[in-house]
């Protein structure tokens, strides 16, 4: 009943209007699974390869080659395999690809099929996806890290840092956290309008006003939290993703919006000052992906005070994470399924992080779809935290709404850790 009898893919569009891969898997008993893959704007150099067509069509962003790889190369390999053997299915695709970064088939082709297989298996067993992936122990609803002010590569403004996030960890449930976040988001819109700033939104649904500095973004968030009736650092704290790999050139950090060029040690001192001044709970990619010595210093100075998340640093890769653990850098990993390219490898990275005392933060990408797989994944692995954008754009809300459904379905079994998740 769970034997794979059909695998096919098609080209669909993501939230930025560029093509991505959607795969469908059909099982012998009639169950079907479908999955779409996201795409990042600021990508780590160590990520698995997203296969694009090049040429004029879709400005070079087409994915016909990846779709063809699913239909003509992956499908014949997987037909006849058991969808319940996720590791076996993923291993077969990895062997077929034969490269360390999935450059042959494309991580977008491999991942779409990998996720669709899991969905089909869950459907065949009559289980919700989070229960299939996590068993009876997957009951933790994540604290949302809501990207409400966008800068860097996610927006056209003078803000160097990419994401300024609300963390409504003082809530008692996911539903309450979502409500608090929404109230602050709408209050922030009113504050921006009052100050004459644009309320246009960036890729992830956050506002992208042309602010004068990175610090102004933080001050506006604190004002919005207070205006909404909450206390910064209590009901709502802050998280940052400065995406500093995008600012790192010739061994220095170039904060062009502020006219500063900082060394690694100066960048660490910068973060120390901000953590002292503001209610910051988490800093993601506070230093560049290959600045290992800088990361060691950052972890030494701030690792006991705030969550230090490696995104470009680890790229959801168990080998990169192992190296980081051995060197004692960061204390959390950002998990993006398309950075590594299969569900099995993603779960391996999460398990390694959790065994090693590192937090795992499940994350979307800036180019998203209506697929809500990561919402179920966050609950399944008891991640405790999720990054899936702001309180606008339906591609972001799809994940939040799925989490609301899961919390309702779990009922009294649902757990929400709040600040204990950090």
Swiss-Prot record:
Main location: cytoplasm
Active-site residue numbers: 204, 336
Residues the entry annotates as binding Mg(2+): 241, 284, 311
InterPro entries named in the record: Enolase, Enolase-like_C_sf, Enolase-like_N, Enolase_C, Enolase_CS, Enolase_N
PROSITE patterns documented for this protein: ENOLASE
Coiled-coil segments on the chain, per record: none
Keyword match Lyase: yes
Residues the record lists as binding (2R)-2-phosphoglycerate: 162, 336, 365-366, 387
Gene Ontology terms, MF aspect: magnesium ion binding; phosphopyruvate hydratase activity
Cofactor(s) needed: Mg(2+)
Pfam families assigned: Enolase_C, Enolase_N
Cofactor, how bound (note): Binds a second Mg(2+) ion via substrate during catalysis.
NCBIfam families reported for this sequence: eno
Stated role: Catalyzes the reversible conversion of 2-phosphoglycerate (2-PG) into phosphoenolpyruvate (PEP). It is essential for the degradation of carbohydrates via glycolysis.
Identification of the protein by name: Enolase
Organism: Thermus thermophilus (strain ATCC 27634 / DSM 579 / HB8)
Originating gene: eno
